Amino acid sequence: APEESPKRAPSGFLGVR
């Protein structure tokens, strides 16, 4: 799940601003 890998998720997803 992207929630476990915020760095793999798109910018501004979970804590990735």
From Swiss-Prot:
Its Gene Ontology cellular component terms are:
extracellular region
- Does the UniProt entry include the keyword Secreted? yes
Arginine amide: modified positions: R17
Give the UniProt subcellular location, in the record's own words.
Secreted
UniProtKB keywords = Amidation, Cleavage on pair of basic residues, Neuropeptide, Secreted
Instruction: Name where it mostly resides.
Output: secreted
Q: In which tissues is it expressed?
A: Midgut and brain.
Q: List, in alphabetical order, the GO biological process terms annotated in this UniProt record.
A: neuropeptide signaling pathway
Record's function text: Myoactive peptide. Increases the amplitude and frequency of spontaneous contractions and tonus of hindgut muscle.
Name assigned to this protein: Tachykinin-related peptide 2
